[in-house]
Swiss-Prot record:
Organism: Borrelia garinii subsp. bavariensis (strain ATCC BAA-2496 / DSM 23469 / PBi)
Chief location bin: cytoplasm
EC numbers, comma separated: 3.1.-.-
Lineage, opening ranks: Bacteria, Pseudomonadati, Spirochaetota, Spirochaetia, Spirochaetales
Name recorded for this polypeptide: Endoribonuclease YbeY
Assigned protein family: Belongs to the endoribonuclease YbeY family.
Pfam families (UniProt xref): YbeY (PF02130)
Cofactor names: Zn(2+)
Gene3D superfamilies: Metalloproteases ('zincins'), catalytic domain
Cofactor annotation comment: Binds 1 zinc ion.
HAMAP family in the record: Endoribonucl_YbeY
Top-level enzyme category: hydrolase
Gene Ontology annotations for the cellular component aspect, listed alphabetically: cytoplasm
Length: 152
């Protein structure tokens, strides 16, 4: 039996576009052929994500996105990629303000990019570098973004 459960939460920030963001995530999951999922996405500030980054990765600094995979049995695994997602994404909206400026993109575009990035990690995709021209995961990320990009 497949599940489709998506929860969006906001911690310590104001975010007024949950409906658009929710629809975007469902569209991304559909594009990636994921119909069986239990996914929670928490949008937060740097303090919140830094605590988690320190606790689980021993890095006492904020980051853009953390992904936590709870599908330990790897149900839905096909060719090393998991098409059944059970996990959490934690995204620092505050951090994205800086990275959006650094990459000269709009903050909501960066939010969409890191959301896709986190979902791809939950599926089992990985990358060695941040080379958007050569890394398969990052190429896929940008293709999925082009197909699903929303205006907030």
């Amino acid at each position: 039996m497949s599940k489709s459960d998506l929860n969006l939460l906001v911690e310590n920030i104001k975010f007024e576009h949950l409906s658009v963001f929710h629809d975007f995530i469902l569209s991304v999951l559909n594009t990636l052929s994921i119909s069986d999922f239990e996914l929670s996405v928490i949008l937060c500030d740097n303090v919140y994500i830094q605590k988690l980054n320190n606790k689980f990765r021993n890095k006492n600094e904020p980051t853009d996105v953390l992904s936590f995979n709870y599908n330990e049995l790897n149900e839905g695994l096909v060719g090393g990629i998991n098409y059944k997602i059970q996990g959490d994404l934690i995204i620092s909206f505050e951090y994205l303000k800086f990275s959006a400026q650094e990459f000269n993109v709009e903050i909501y575009e960066e939010l969409q990019r890191v959301t896709i990035h986190g979902i791809l990690h939950l599926m089992g995709h990985n990358h060695e570098t941040n080379d958007f021209q050569k890394e398969g995961m990052l190429i896929l990320q940008e293709n999925v973004l082009r197909k699903n990009k929303r205006v907030f």
